[in-house]
Design a protein with these regions (language model features):
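Soluble acyl-CoA-dependent acyltransferase catalytic core bearing the H(X)4D motif
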Residues: 1-7, 26-348
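Generic start-of-chain signal for non-secretory N-termini
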Residues: 1-22
Length: 348
């Protein structure tokens, strides 16, 4: 058994019917040279890669009485008909129809008794192409691990395929712990955590002294963020929109402004939000605050889990202003350094 970290488990605890912790991506493919049996070939392609990543073969097992975080266990009875599905758009198969279908699929929570992932191959695009929608649970992995998963999944070179057909995993060498053993282990882990509390308090106190004014400045964001038309109760329905940006263009803008790609993306998002709020006559006087995920993953770390923190970044009121962007970038970098230090002390 592989116990989830507190961060991974938080995505389980925070899930509600209105806010399933699904993460997804959509890949759009050009019309295939051989359009026959596209789904069957995709299913075989996916099945041949099931042993390359632990994500595909593991499911959650809850701890008795909720005494500890859930754990990952091997699923020896994987049902590919549940995990790899087929859908089709009605004619004419526009992008709006694709977005509407993906929104409906993304609103459906994943079954926690099965491995937490699904692929949908969606046919019927108006140009003859097809799309693949990949859905997984945030407790599985973060964005960096997600990209590594897609790199392995969408590598269609002949030398990337496994040398042998997929195997059904052998039963675990040790049987799954029974209720008494799991409970005993969970209680022991809980007591170890209690004994570690004095050290945690010392670490927190030291971190607070080191962070000083930066901590007060960043935490003040939480109290100065204005309320907008987005601050409403979330329903079970989802909307899905898309936009395309040229990565070379984004890199060129970042280089010209001596900022990062993340800075450019934040400026684009801030500009879009500003335009939307102006059009709806609800632009607040104070700037908005964005919670931006940032990776804490060390180079070469390929584990399938979450290693990230959230940076609180104040969005410029005039994000397209060159002066505003140049002034905001050093301030944001300073606040990011503060939060990175907080994360290194176990606060992230």
């Amino acid at each position: 058994m592989n116990r989830l970290s507190a961060l991974d488990a938080s995505f389980i605890y925070g899930e509600t019917p209105e806010t399933p912790m699904n993460v997804g991506s959509v890949a759009i493919f050009a019309p295939p040279a051989n359009p026959d049996d596209v789904f069957a070939r995709f299913r075989d392609h996916t099945a041949a890669r099931l042993d390359l990543l632990p994500l595909y073969r593991r499911r959650l097992e809850m701890t008795p009485l909720g005494l500890d975080h859930p754990a990952w266990v091997d699923d020896d009875d994987l049902d590919l008909d549940y995990h790899i599905r087929r859908a089709a758009l009605p004619k004419p198969g526009t992008m709006n129809q694709l977005r509407a279908l993906v929104a409906r699929l993304h609103a459906i929570p994943l079954n926690h008794t099965r491995p937490l992932w699904q692929y949908y191959l969606i046919e019927g695009l108006e140009d003859g192409g097809f799309a693949v929608y990949f859905k997984f649970h945030h407790c599985d992995m973060d964005g960096v691990a997600h990209m590594a998963t897609l790199d392995g999944m969408y590598d269609f070179s002949s030398d990337s395929a496994p040398a042998s057909p997929p195997r059904k995993p052998a039963p675990s060498a040790a049987p799954s712990p029974d209720f008494l053993e799991q409970t005993t282990t969970a209680v022991a882990d809980f007591l170890r955590q209690v004994r570690s509390l004095p050290n945690l308090v010392t670490t927190l106190a030291k971190a607070s002294r080191n962070l000083g004014r930066d901590a007060q400045y960043s935490l003040a964001y939480l109290w100065k963020t204005p309320r907008t038309r987005f601050n409403v109760a979330v329903s079970t329905q989802r909307s899905y929109g898309t936009a395309s940006l040229s990565l070379p263009d984004v890199k060129a803008v970042a280089k010209a402004g001596n900022v990062t790609i993340n800075d450019v993306v934040l400026a684009v998002c801030a500009g879009a939000l500003r335009r939307y709020l102006i059009e709806h006559r609800s632009l607040p006087d104070l700037p908005l605050t964005a919670a931006v995920p940032a990776s804490l993953r060390a180079p070469g770390d390929t584990r399938m889990n979450n290693q990230l923190m959230f940076l609180l970044c104040r969005l410029c009121k005039r994000p397209c202003s060159t002066t505003g962007a140049r002034h905001a970038a050093p301030q944001r970098q300073s606040r990011c350094r503060f939060l990175a230090r907080a994360g290194s002390h176990g606060l992230g």
